[in-house]
A protein has these predicted regions:
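Catalytic NTP-binding/metal-coordinating core of nucleotidyl cyclase/transferase enzymes
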Residues: 205-289
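Regulatory cytosolic signal-relay segments
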Residues: 160-213
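Alpha-helical scaffold within the catalytic cores of cyclic-nucleotide enzymes
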Residues: 38, 243-257, 274, 278-317, ...
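Short hydrophobic beta-strand micro-motif common in sensory/regulatory domains
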Residues: 130-138
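Regulatory loop-to-helix N-cap segments in sensory/regulatory domains
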Residues: 2-5, 150-166, 339
Length: 398
């Protein structure tokens, strides 16, 4: 489906501004927002066949996100620019770089390109576009976004068109800033707290003592000989090794619905919550499969590390299932989310036994009853700080 774009015969941005402050500002999805914004502009006579809205982010992997509307297909093309993108030819010398460095609008007639023009211009010109306008969107702390418009009208953008777009940009800025702050908060919460915990904080679970009782499959893992490694390796190499370890474990657990709740030095506390989306058996199988996958990935990773003369990585995993307190604890002005309870303690003690029993993955009796993978009984064992002895199990071929 395509959208018919009118010739520039004079138009007013007021209907679009009215929409922005009524329905538009309530749209939480940026793709839908850009699509509806484009439709509103076309409906009031703006001569555009392409609209792009880009927003800078604070994310360890992504520098900016953008959504591009194209009239010929009436569709949205999303894009996430990795931090490395800023060092590529795609960005260097581009109108986007010019805009973000000067914080001034960029205008270029695409039917009058100079020799050696950047690919961002020539590709649009090859598609029949005649004019390009990029407007900076300023936030309270500086430049945070940009609105980019292109047309195929033979005469390009008129002075009236550009002034109307400038007026619209001024009304658009506070709405995009609020949207950016909301999603920035969500991104930072997910990055530093995890998705489940971040959502709880944003939903208002922020007072000390706020807690839920949840049922979950639990994972506790710990690197072998980490103290020795920190004493003998340069700090930079230790950090690189930790990040490599955390990355492949994260990939294994998040693929199956697990959430890294805490990094504790070289240890990881991970939960597979049992809820409407994941029953008890499913959660336990997911936790075990994640542990097996992580250990499998470790084998190939260590093969590479040996070739490069780097120390191998080794870690144990304790798995358990039970009821835990998932809550907000700490000092009045410094809080943290954590999981507490006897089930958590036993999970950590199971991991400690992986060293003495020579198995990389150990789990409790109740956990063994809920998994589909055959397990081996390794006897009753004492656990530090826990009365009596506890049954310990392992995967048959571990």
């Amino acid at each position: 489906m395509s959208v018919t774009v009118p010739e520039s015969l004079g138009w007013s941005p007021q209907p679009v501004i009215d929409w922005l402050f009524s329905e538009g500002r309530l749209l939480d999805d940026n793709s839908r927002f850009v699509l509806q914004l484009a439709h509103q502009l076309v409906a009031c006579g703006a001569p555009i066949e392409r609209l792009l809205l880009t927003i800078q982010t604070l994310n360890p992997e992504i520098a900016a996100t953008s959504n591009t509307w194209i009239s010929s297909t009436d569709s949205i093309v999303p894009f996430s620019a990795q931090h490395g993108t800023l060092k590529t030819d795609r960005y260097i010398g581009s109108p986007m770089q010019q805009l973000f460095e000067t914080e001034k609008r960029v205008r270029q007639r695409l039917d009058q390109l100079p020799e050696g023009a950047h690919a961002a211009y020539t590709e649009l010109a090859d598609d029949g576009f005649t004019d390009y306008l990029a407007l900076p969107i300023m936030f309270n702390w500086g430049l945070g976004s940009a609105l980019i418009l292109s047309t195929k009208c033979a005469q390009g953008f008129s002075g009236t068109d550009i002034e109307n777009f400038r007026i619209l940009r001024n009304y658009l800025s506070p709405i995009i800033e609020v949207y950016s702050l909301r999603h920035l908060s969500k991104s930072l919460m997910n990055t530093y707290l995890g998705k489940r915990t971040g959502e709880k904080v944003l939903s208002g679970m922020i007072q000390r003592g706020d807690a839920d009782i949840i049922h979950a499959a639990l994972w506790f893992s710990d690197l072998r000989d980490f103290t020795h490694l920190t004493e003998t390796l340069p700090a930079r190499q230790v950090l690189e090794m930790l990040n490599e370890y955390f990355e492949f474990v994260s990939a294994a657990v998040t693929a199956r619905g697990g959430e890294i709740l805490r990094f504790i030095g070289d240890a990881m506390l991970i939960v597979f919550p049992i809820d409407d989306d994941m029953c008890q058996r499913t959660a336990c199988n997911a936790a075990l499969d994640s542990a097996i996958d992580a250990q499998s990935t470790l084998a190939s990773l260590n093969h590479r590390r040996r070739r490069h003369g780097e120390p191998e990585i080794s870690f144990g995993v304790g798995l358990n299932v039970g009821e835990v307190v998932y809550g907000n604890v700490g000092a009045p002005d410094r809080l943290d989310f954590t999981v507490m309870g006897p089930a958590v303690n036993r999970t950590a003690r199971l991991e400690s036994l992986t060293k003495t029993l020579g198995c990389n993955i150990l789990f409790s009796e109740r956990f063994s009853e809920l998994i589909d993978t055959p397990s081996s009984y390794l006897g009753m064992h004492e656990m530090k700080g826990i009365d009596g002895t506890q049954a310990v199990y392992a995967v048959c071929d571990s």
